[in-house]
Regions:
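Bacterial flagellar/type III secretion structural subunits and associated motility module proteins
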Residues: 1-47, 68-199, 204-310, 339-506, ...
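Juxtamembrane membrane-water interface segments immediately C-terminal to a transmembrane helix
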Residues: 39, 50-53, 512
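Long, contiguous alpha-helical "rod/stalk" segments
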Residues: 54-62
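Acidic/charged coordination and interface sites in well-structured regions
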Residues: 65
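Short, glycine/acidic-rich hinge or "gate" loops at secondary-structure transitions
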Residues: 78-83, 196-197, 313-329, 538-539
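Structured, hydrophobic secondary-structure cores that serve as assembly/anchoring elements
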Residues: 311-314, 318, 508-541
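Intrinsically disordered, low-complexity segments enriched in small/polar residues
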Residues: 324-346
Length: 542
């Protein structure tokens, strides 16, 4: 750092020591070393704060990654707050050409029989072959040409038509191909395709079911266009609902009930069916213990990684240059020190200087203690230990350990209890502004995942409380991409250090200039004395 400061300060071209023969630059630099040392010290303090902030942010990112994976409702496969996530089944069907199925949370029955009488279909129309060519048109024909050929009305040099009540407008200088794209991209709910090989159009509704339709007869332009393209447009075309009988369900007259759905994929009592053909199929579900176990294990493994990371940060000691408990702590290198070292030496030094900066950090201790409590305290449904998940020693951060056999047995024997331990939800919603009484009540009524969710919210929440506060870790170190990246405690301290550094450099510059002026006066005086001495010598020697 001393040399960098010298570079900043020595921006003037100076001619020094001409009369005295002294190395004025070296003398001045030596005389301001105390001030340079002050700047170096504050720069080191600033660097330590920046490294500390980086350490905090690495933990923030780890917690956010954990939250994104297991607490995101948009990721149902790993959303551990939902009971549905814990119910997994193996599914077998006797005829996949009739129907397939998968579980969607807890199912009411494990065996089902489905008789498919009709698949859901889209509304569909096909044009006669070659009709476009017979009208002397092509897909590249201008809308004006299409209008003239098919008797369409243009207004303000635009074609307007309605399909399913949705108006579509296009300029006369556009092409038929552009019109097809405009229809497909509109909210009319239909899609048109064209085969140049067959010179044939196909129109389909985007949705299936009896409510899906293609209505072009209510608008003269639309009717004439489609008629001219070779379609039969005498009536509105409708799709079809899927029709099936499920599990022999009967009505009051003893007749099997025919159920209709507007799609071939639908969910009934936790089972999602996909119909593939007409016929009968039997579907059997069996609980997939291994899949449920793996979901829980993945969650616990990620939790343990966080516990291990934070435990390491709050317990690792700052190394000293003289070994254990001896010598000074490793500090950030000054520029002068860096210039005297190799890249490898610098890397090794900085690794040590970055170690132990969060030792005994109270904020991280708080995260750790609350996470441990959330997972280890009893819930109203029992504790994790009762299903084979126990806490290790405090020396290894009290990580959780899974007894695979015991957990799998708990899943097989009483999955509902396992789910309740993890996901039981309080009637009180999370809020950073909840009173201590409400927090205590919510904690008591919640499962371990809900409790852990509250911890994450308190520490890495990006929304503000009524007092304007975000998560505690964000207020401390900030989150990249969030307003707290620049508005947080550590960044404020870093900026204050930078301001102080600039203040010290300004004072150092002033002192250096003052010294150079004094030496310049000295050089001038010596030069005059030398000139006088020469004059006396010359005159007395005559």
């Amino acid at each position: 750092m001393a040399s960098s400061i010298s570079n900043i300060l020595n921006t003037k071209l100076r001619f020094t020591g001409m009369a005295s023969g002294l190395d004025t630059d070296a003398i001045v630099q030596q005389m301001i070393r105390v001030q340079q040392a002050k700047v170096d010290k504050v720069k080191q303090e600033k660097q330590l704060l920046e490294w500390k902030r980086d350490d905090y942010r690495s933990i923030i990112n780890m917690l956010r990654s954990f939250k994104d994976e297991f607490f995101d409702v948009l990721k149902p496969a790993t959303y551990m707050r939902s009971s549905s996530t814990y119910y997994a089944y193996k599914v077998k069907t006797t005829d996949e050409n009739v129907a397939t199925a998968k579980s969607n949370g807890k199912v009411a029955m494990m065996e089902h029989t489905i008789k498919v009488e009709q698949l859901a279909e889209k509304a569909k129309m096909e044009s006669r072959v070659g009709e476009l060519g017979l009208n002397g048109l092509s897909m590249d024909s201008k809308i004006s040409e299409v209008a003239n050929s098919l008797g369409l009305n243009l207004e303000d040099n635009k074609l307007s038509l309605e399909i399913n009540g949705e108006e579509i407008k296009i300029s006369a200088d556009k092409t038929l191909n552009d019109l097809i794209s405009a229809i497909n991209n509109s909210d009319a709910g239909v899609r048109i395709s064209y085969s140049s090989f067959l010179d044939k159009f196909i129109v389909e509704s985007k949705a299936t079911g009896a409510d899906a339709k293609i209505d072009v007869i209510s608008n003269s332009n639309a009717k004439n266009l489609f008629y001219g393209l070779g379609f039969d447009v005498d009536e509105v075309k409708y799709g079809k609902n899927a029709k099936f009988k499920l599990d022999g369900k009967k009505d009051s007259n003893g007749q099997e009930v025919i159920t209709e759905k507007n799609s071939n994929t639908f969910t009934i009592d936790g089972v999602t069916y996909t119909l593939t053909g007409v016929g009968e199929a039997k579907i059997t579900l069996t609980q997939d213990t291994d899949a449920i176990y793996e979901k829980i294990k993945s969650f616990i493994d990620k939790y343990n990684e966080i516990v291990e990371k934070i435990t390491t940060k709050v317990t690792e000691k700052r190394p000293r240059s003289g070994g254990t408990d001896k010598g000074d702590y490793y500090l950030p290198l000054t520029d002068e020190q860096r210039e005297a070292m190799t890249e490898d030496e610098i890397k090794k030094w900085e690794e040590k200087a970055k170690t132990g900066l969060l030792r005994n950090d109270s904020l991280l201790h708080g995260v750790l203690e609350r996470m441990r409590s959330a997972m280890n305290d009893l819930t109203e449904a029992g504790g994790l230990f009762s299903i084979g998940i126990s806490t290790g020693s405090w020396r290894n951060g009290a990580k959780l350990f899974i007894d695979e056999d015991k957990l799998k047995k708990a899943i097989e024997d009483n999955l509902d209890k396992v789910v309740e331990i993890f996901t039981k939800t309080s009637e009180i919603s999370y809020s950073p502004d909840n009173s201590s009484e409400l927090r205590d009540k919510r904690y008591k009524e919640s499962g371990v995942v809900e409790r852990l969710f509250d911890v994450l919210q308190d520490y890495i929440r990006t929304t503000r409380s009524e007092s304007g506060q975000k998560g505690l870790l964000l207020e401390k170190a900030g989150l990249v991409g969030d307003v707290t990246e620049y508005q947080n405690t550590l960044t404020k301290q870093i900026n204050e250090k930078q301001d102080y550094i600039q203040e010290l450099i300004n004072k150092l510059y002033e002192k250096q200039e003052s010294l150079y002026i004094k030496f310049a006066y000295m050089e001038t005086a010596l030069s005059r004395m030398s000139a006088q001495s020469s004059w006396f010598t010359q005159n007395f020697n005559r």
